[in-house]
């Protein structure tokens, strides 16, 4: 999975031709570390949605722009807009169900 930065966010996420799930996370966040391998599995199993990571400690302006107040916080972007919010660590089946329309 690609790591997005403040500088790459517009190109990698907002201007993407495909839907993009952004996993807003931090290294110190236990639930974030729990959901990371699940996202990697989903990313490797399909090609319809891109999954990227945005570190809120390294890029606090992204967290502020998208009002990230708790993590893990995942947002699906399509056409430059947030179309789905998923907050908290969830099992793979629940996450896949939340993303079903894009998988």
State what each model feature region is:
Residues 78-103:
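Non-catalytic, surface beta->alpha helical segment in thiol-disulfide oxidoreductase systems
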Residues 17-19, 34-54:
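Conserved helix-turn-beta segment immediately C-terminal to the redox Cys motif
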Residues 24-38:
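Conserved redox-active cysteine motifs that mediate thiol-disulfide chemistry
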Residues 2-19, 60:
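A short beta-strand-turn-helix
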Residues 60, 66-75:
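Structural micro-motif
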């Amino acid at each position: 999975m690609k790591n997005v930065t403040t500088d790459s966010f517009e190109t990698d996420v907002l201007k993407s031709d495909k839907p993009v799930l952004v996993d807003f996370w931090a290294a110190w966040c236990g639930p974030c570390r729990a959901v990371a391998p699940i996202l990697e599995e989903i990313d490797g199993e399909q090609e319809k949605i891109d999954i990227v990571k945005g570190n809120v400690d390294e890029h606090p302006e992204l967290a502020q722009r998208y009002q990230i107040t708790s993590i893990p916080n995942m947002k699906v972007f399509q056409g430059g807009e947030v179309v789905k919010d998923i907050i908290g660590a969830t099992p793979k089946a629940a996450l896949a169900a939340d993303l079903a329309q894009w998988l």
